[in-house]
Amino acid sequence: MSGPVTEAARAKINLTLRVLGKRADGYHELQSLVVFAQSGDRLTAREADELRLDVAGRFAAALQGEPDNLVLRAARMLREETGIKSGAHLTLEKNLPVASGIGGGSADAAAALRALTALWGVAPGDEVLSRIAAALGADVLVCLHSRTAMMWGKGEKIMPLADLPRFWLVLANAGIALSTAAVFRELAAAPLAAAPSDPAPVPPGTLDDLAAWLAAEGNDLEPPALTLAPEIGETISALALTAGCLLARMSGSGATCFGLYAAEEEAREAALVLQAAHPGWWLEVSAAGG
């Protein structure tokens, strides 16, 4: 009998997100610089005869009654690819807001793949895991390794980055859930006119240099998300007004936003100020980068 295996499902933050156009296959051509927070969900896998999933934690209620879940889909696909007959009792501690632009479901699915390969003692290899991840969703592959990276294409092209300056993030969500599909519909991206080139490298330099580059790159999903949920603008403004904030922006398709800070003390003070002014908000502080 193998003991339980627990994996962290860390929040994915899109520091930049460019939508270059809609591809012929229906997917959008993207370029995004992503980092991973220290906070996130937790997934535990235990031996069992059948596959089953229990969800607990602050945001568990948002997943109750789902007929299918990315975690279970990941487990079934891994079992099919490896031919394993074992089951597993999966417990997901849901600490991240649902439908919030920080890759929670994708990170959970990736954590399930990591946990179950260990629990079942299988080694499907990178090619198989990448194929499963791509079938589950555009963000699952980058969440498998949960490392700072530039990702592009529909999420299948990933270049790890190890030399970003270290910084601190305050993550803030005012209790808004946004459908990724709805945000893309509102964006109404034009068809991709030509095969895009690879993204330009992140220029080396100081944290101030990085913040200036991030500001210029932007998040193309922020305007359509603001149209659907104007309250996101209030979250961004509140972050931007905190002392030491170098950049305030929405992550992914929203509605979670982040503030970027040079020092831990600045980030923690900002979170305290925001919590006092907005006691209902979800707030997390995390290091990222270097």
Curated annotation (Swiss-Prot):
InterPro entries registered for this protein in UniProt: GHMP_kinase_C_dom, GHMP_kinase_C_sf, GHMP_kinase_N_dom, IspE, Ribosomal_Su5_D2-typ_SF, Ribsml_uS5_D2-typ_fold_subgr
Keyword Nucleotide-binding tagged: yes
GO terms of biological process kind: isopentenyl diphosphate biosynthetic process, methylerythritol 4-phosphate pathway; terpenoid biosynthetic process
Enzyme Commission identifier(s): 2.7.1.148
Keywords: ATP-binding, Isoprene biosynthesis, Kinase, Nucleotide-binding, Transferase
PANTHER family per the UniProt record, alphabetical: 4-DIPHOSPHOCYTIDYL-2-C-METHYL-D-ERYTHRITOL KINASE, CHLOROPLASTIC (PTHR43527:SF2)
Recorded family membership: Belongs to the GHMP kinase family. IspE subfamily.
Protein name: 4-diphosphocytidyl-2-C-methyl-D-erythritol kinase
Source taxonomy: Bacteria, Pseudomonadati, Pseudomonadota, Alphaproteobacteria, Hyphomicrobiales
